[in-house]
C-alpha cells in the first residue's frame, strides 16, 4: 500500500511540540495490548489541514501526547487541504487518522454534495471534538435583521463545492429559499471579506470556530452583526441533517448586543476502518485522559469535552473508540 509523506516539516513540528510538552504527562502510559498486530509497526500518519489553520497544530499536539502515552506508537502529522482530501487519504489507506468536518464525512458516506457520485468507504469515526459554527455575518447598518430578510440581497455562500456552500444552501432551504431568491456570489472567505469591506456584499456565510479572527478584523472597518439561525428552522435543520447541533455564540465573542443562536457542525477525528480495535482504543483513551495537557498545548484542546465525544456523529464509530466510550459511559 502506497503511503505518501509530505515534507519533514510536519515531523519536526511534532518533535518540537514533544520537547515543549515533556514533563506534562497525563494519567500515565497506555500500553498497547498484545492482541492484534499493530498497523505499519505502530507508525501512523495523521492528516490535518494547512499549516496556518487549526487542524495542523492541534493534530500535532495530539500526536505528541499520544506518542508519549501509548507504547510503540509513532504518529506523524501531515499537512493537507483539510476535510475532503483527508477523507480520501484515509479511505485509500494513505493516512491512518485525520481531522475532518462531520458534515463533509456525511456527504462522503452518502456520495452526495462534495462527493456526488463517489460514495466513500473504509472510514470510521473516532471522536467528535469541537464545534465549527455556521456564522451569517451582516453589516450592523444593513437593516438585515433575520435570515428571511436575505431575499433579494447580495449574499456570498462560500466557494463553489465547499462545505460552507452546502451549509448555506441548507440554511436557505430551511427558511423556504433557494439561490434564486438571493443575488448569490460564490466567494472564498477572503474574497467575501474583501467584498464586504467594500460594501459589495450584504451578508456572507462562514463556517468556523469562534472567535474568527477575520470577522473580528472586519468589524474594525465595518461594524458587523450576526444573524440568528434558530426556532423551527434550526429544529428542521437538525432533524433533516443530523450532523448539525444547535449552539449559542456568547455576546462577548463579537460584541453583539445579545447571544447569537445558530447551528454548528463538528470537527471530528476519523480513522481507517481496518485499524484494529486495540490501537484505536488506545488512541482514544490516551487523547481523552490527557485533555488538560492538550488544552495547555493548544487553545482548542480546552473545547474538547468527553461528554460531547459522540455529538453530531452520523458515520459509525470505530469499534475501538466505541469500546472506550462505552467504558466511560458516553454515547
Question: Where is each model-derived feature located?
Answer:
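Short, low-complexity disordered leader/linker segments with a strong preference
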Residues: 1-43
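Conserved N-terminal glycine/acidic-rich loop preference
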Residues: 36-45, 54-61, 84-105, 135
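Extracytoplasmic
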Residues: 41, 70-72, 82-85, 92, ...
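Bilobed "Venus flytrap"/periplasmic-binding protein-like clamshell domains
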Residues: 41-69, 73-77, 132-198, 315, ...
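Sec-exported extracytoplasmic/periplasmic mature domains
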Residues: 63-71, 91-95, 110, 155, ...
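Acidic, polar ligand-binding/catalytic clefts
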Residues: 95-130, 212
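Pocket-lining segment of extracytoplasmic ligand-binding domains
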Residues: 102-104, 110-114, 142, 179-269, ...
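Segments of small-molecule ligand-sensing domains
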Residues: 260-331
Amino acid at each position: 500500500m502506497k503511503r505518501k509523506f509530505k515534507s519533514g516539516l510536519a515531523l519536526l513540528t511534532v518533535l518540537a511540540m514533544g520537547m515543549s510538552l515533556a514533563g506534562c504527562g497525563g494519567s500515565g502510559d497506555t500500553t498497547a495490548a498484545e492482541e492484534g498486530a499493530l498497523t505499519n509497526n505502530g507508525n501512523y500518519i495523521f492528516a490535518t489541514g494547512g499549516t496556518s489553520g487549526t487542524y495542523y497544530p492541534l493534530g500535532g499536539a495530539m500526536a505528541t501526547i499520544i506518542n508519549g502515552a501509548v507504547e510503540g506508537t509513532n504518529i506523524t502529522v501531515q499537512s493537507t487541504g483539510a476535510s475532503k482530501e483527508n477523507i480520501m487519504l484515509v479511505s485509500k489507506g494513505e493516512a491512518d487518522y485525520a481531522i475532518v468536518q462531520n458534515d463533509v464525512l456525511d456527504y462522503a458516506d452518502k456520495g452526495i454534495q462534495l462527493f456526488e457520485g463517489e460514495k466513500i468507504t473504509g472510514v470510521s469515526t473516532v471522536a467528535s471534538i469541537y464545534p465549527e459554527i455556521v456564522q451569517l455575518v451582516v453589516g450592523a447598518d444593513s437593516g438585515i435583521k433575520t435570515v428571511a430578510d436575505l431575499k433579494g440581497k447580495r449574499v456570498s455562500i462560500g466557494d463553489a463545492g465547499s462545505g460552507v456552500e452546502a451549509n448555506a444552501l441548507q440554511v436557505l432551504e430551511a427558511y423556504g429559499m433557494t439561490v434564486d431568491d438571493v443575488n448569490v456570489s460564490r466567494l472564498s472567505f477572503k474574497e467575501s471579506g474583501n467584498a464586504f469591506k467594500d460594501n459589495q456584499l450584504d451578508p456572507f456565510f462562514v463556517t468556523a470556530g469562534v472567535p474568527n479572527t477575520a470577522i473580528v478584523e472586519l468589524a474594525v472597518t465595518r461594524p458587523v452583526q450576526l444573524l440568528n439561525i434558530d426556532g423551527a428552522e434550526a429544529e428542521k435543520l437538525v432533524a433533516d441533517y443530523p450532523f448539525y447541533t444547535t449552539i449559542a455564540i456568547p455576546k462577548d465573542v463579537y460584541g453583539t448586543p445579545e447571544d447569537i443562536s445558530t447551528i454548528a457542525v463538528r470537527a471530528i477525528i476519523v480513522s481507517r476502518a481496518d485499524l484494529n480495535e486495540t490501537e484505536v482504543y488506545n488512541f482514544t483513551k490516551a487523547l481523552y485522559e490527557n485533555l488538560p495537557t492538550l488544552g495547555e498545548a493548544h487553545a482548542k484542546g480546552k473545547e474538547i469535552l468527553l461528554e460531547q465525544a459522540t455529538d453530531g456523529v452520523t458515520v459509525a464509530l470505530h469499534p475501538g473508540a466505541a469500546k472506550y466510550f462505552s467504558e466511560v459511559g458516553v454515547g
